[in-house]
Amino acid sequence: MTQVPILRPSEDVSVDQDELARIYIQMDCAADDMVAQAIEELALRLPHAETLYQQSLPGDLAACAASISTIAARLGMTTLARVAGDVTACCASGDPAALAATLSRMIRLGEGSLREIWDLQDLPI
């Protein structure tokens, strides 16, 4: 009998610590609130994007992915921001395989980026 390999996709995530430092320098006391709110928004929008995909709502998914891209860019999550932009493009392309793969990658990156920024900010998960 042939064994079927089990794939466990993983993503290398990174948060641009210089970008986070810039936020804290520019915003001073308000930075904690802004970063916490942005983290919360990402934590809500990532599963919402998955729901929109399952409901076959590509227009709404594109808007959700665009907002994820904007939030991620503000927090220095450059790879997540780029891949969320790719999800937006896939919604317009009409290629269901590309959309499924890219959305899955965005979710993996998003979850990993949130874990990393929580560690950097010393926030409980």
Question: Where does each model-flagged region fall?
Answer:
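Two-component system phosphorelay core
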Residues: 1-63, 67-74, 78-125
